[in-house]
Swiss-Prot record:
It is found in: Secreted. It comes from Macaca mulatta (Rhesus macaque). This is Growth hormone variant. Belongs to the somatotropin/prolactin family. Residues 1-26 form the signal peptide. InterPro entries: 4_helix_cytokine-like_core, Somatotropin, Somatotropin/Prolactin, Somatotropin_CS. CDD domains: somatotropin_like (cd10285).
Length: 217
């Protein structure tokens, strides 16, 4: 076959295949249920990680007297994320819209992107996961991205919840500069456990509303 004929044949095949290639290049829409299940799983994993690590750190290094004084003192038990208004009970949670709960969850996750790096050594020393390559910061980033995707999918044209003012960790860290590293990590872990529990609760609530048959799962 002449060179010109080969060129025409190749061009014809390419043109015939073009619509198929274009169709195949488009990613199918990810099911909403999968997005929710992934986000809930990640939030649960982070909460469980903190829940399992906290008593081990406490038992190994924190004297009982120091523990009780810490819990009774509103200054030391106050978390830097308290500046983010969150529902304090089930009734208040149910009064929030899906987008509001997702936005609050997003703010809580974002507030931890800086301080969680101080907890890496705590989690590494106190076990819990068998994957030595686990990176808690990257895991938080994945959860942040997942929540942002859910917000985009649930956006119905209603105005987004405005940015809520929150104190930075740097301000909190300055106020606690007299604490030794161990006590500071203890306080951080205490707050991280509380906040991840909130995020998991809020995500489960929204999933229950948005995905049929997912309540209690």
């Amino acid at each position: 076959m002449a060179a010109g004929s080969w060129t025409c044949l190749i061009l014809a095949i390419a043109l015939l295949c073009l619509p198929w290639l274009q169709e195949g290049s488009a990613f199918p829409t990810i099911p909403l249920s999968w997005l929710f299940n992934t986000a809930v799983f990640r939030a649960h994993h982070l909460h469980k990680l903190a829940f399992d690590t906290y008593p081990k750190l406490e038992e190994a290094y924190i004297p009982k007297e120091q523990k009780y004084s810490f819990l009774r003192n509103p200054q030391t038990s106050l978390c830097f994320s308290e500046s983010i208004p969150t529902p304090s009970n089930k009734e208040e949670t149910q009064q929030k819209s899906n987008l509001e709960l997702l936005h609050i969850s997003l703010l809580l996750i974002q507030s931890w992107l800086e301080p969680v790096q101080f907890l890496r050594s705590v989690f590494a020393n106190h076990l819990v996961h068998t994957n030595s390559n686990f990176d808690i910061y990257l895991y938080l980033k994945k959860l942040e991205e997942g929540i942002q995707t859910l917000m985009e999918r649930l956006e119905d044209g209603s105005p987004r919840t405005g940015q809520i003012f929150k104190e930075t960790y740097s301000k909190y860290d300055t106020n606690s500069h007299n604490d030794d590293t161990l006590l500071k990590n203890y306080r951080l872990l205490y707050c991280f456990r509380k906040d991840m529990n909130k995020v998991e609760t809020f995500l489960r609530t929204v999933r229950c509303r948005a995905v049929e048959g997912s309540c209690g799962f």
